[in-house]
Amino acid sequence: MMDNARQFLTIYENSSNYSERLLSLYNGLFLLLGERLYDEAEKCGVDKASFLDALKYIREDEEGGKTILDEENLEALYSLLSSLLTA
């Protein structure tokens, strides 16, 4: 499970595509946290409703032209995933 989560972290680090970056963070965090994902994300300052809206938007619009979570929120999720993998 940890190796799979690390692969998602690597995808995030090597991508400039918003949709791919967000989904890689979501997938890595979901592997490690399951249903606790949103609670832990909120502890890092990422609003659960905004997170869910961002995921919904990506599913509805593969173009990914609109950014719902800003770079600061993506970095918070990245930090959460990184810390879980180094703990």
Regions of interest found by a model, annotated:
Residues 1-87:
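Amphipathic, oligomerization/interface secondary-structure segments
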